[in-house]
Structure formats: C-alpha cells, structure tokens
C-alpha cells in the first residue's frame, strides 16, 4: 500500500464511535504460521497472505466469535487494478495471474512436461468468457468491464471466500 489507512481508521473511529484494535504481526510470526495456514487450507496457498489472515483471526477470536466481513467488496465494486488498467483488461487471461510462464516453472520437471499450464488456463479462461452475456447496447469498454467482473466474481472471489472461511474456522471464528 502506498499510504497507511490509519488516518481514515481514526476518522471513522471518531465519527462512528467504534472500538478498533491494531494487530501487528512480524515476519518471524508469519513464517511460524505458514504450516498452520497450509493445514487450514488443506493445501499450499498464498503463503504469508494466508498466515497473516490466520493470525488476524486468531487475535480477533480473543474478543469475539463471529464478525461481519468486508471480503468481496473489491470484487463487487471494481476495486482491483485490473478493473481500470488497460494492460490488465487486455491481457487475454485471468488478470491476477498473468505470469503463467513463471508459474509453469514452479512445477517439477516431470509434472511440468505433463501439464501444459498455459493451455489449461487459456481453455478455462475462454470457457468462462463464453458464459458472459454481452448486451447489444454495450460499448466495447462496457463489454470488457462485464467480462472482467464475471471472471473476478466467478474465480477470484471464490478463492478469497474459501480462504477467509478456512483461516477463520481454523481459529473457531465465524464470518458472515
């Protein structure tokens, strides 16, 4: 993040009379909880992003057992760079995973030869886009936004919902 949210948090806290607590997690603690995050997910996931969320819920659980979440607001209201950056809109693939060749290299050589990651991703991307209903009245820009919204809601958002639910429930914390 280019700027801290503290100014806005304090402003909201003052005007809405809410009670906020700051949770600071350091790098060694993030690393310590990587395995727990992987267990919570039942597979490797987003590494430190998962462990930080798991630790966040662990700390919040000390005060309460259930919470409303703002998860998916960016997906619904177009808060990600791929909703407005031309290079992302015109990437021809899922905009949050443009670096397919780098991901292919993560596979061991035997699996890498058997799995054509690019072909699979292209297939799923095009299959998903074929389900998007473009209106006759849509401008090209609106059609692209409609496509990117569909991809985000049906792929990216589902991943985040699953991730949040698993990290919370690992701590006995419930999200709504």
Please identify what each model-predicted range represents.
Residues 157:
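Catalytic donor/gating beta->alpha subdomain of glycosyltransferases that bind UDP-sugars
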């Amino acid at each position: 993040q280019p700027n801290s949210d503290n100014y806005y948090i304090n402003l909201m806290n003052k005007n809405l009379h809410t009670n906020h607590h700051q949770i600071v997690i350091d790098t060694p603690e993030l690393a310590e909880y990587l395995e727990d995050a992987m267990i919570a997910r039942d597979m490797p996931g987003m590494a430190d992003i998962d462990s930080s969320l798991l630790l966040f819920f662990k700390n919040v659980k000390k005060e309460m057992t259930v919470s409303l979440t703002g998860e998916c607001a960016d997906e619904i209201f177009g808060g990600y760079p791929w909703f407005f950056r031309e290079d992302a809109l015109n990437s021809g693939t899922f905009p949050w995973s443009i670096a397919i060749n780098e991901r292919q290299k993560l596979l061991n050589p035997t699996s890498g030869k058997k799995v054509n990651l690019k072909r699979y991703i292209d297939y799923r991307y095009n299959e998903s886009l074929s389900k998007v209903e473009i209106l006759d009245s849509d401008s090209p820009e609106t059609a692209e936004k409609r496509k990117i919204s569909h991809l985000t809601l049906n792929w990216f958002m589902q991943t985040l919902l699953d991730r949040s639910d698993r990290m919370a429930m690992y701590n006995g914390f419930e999200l709504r």
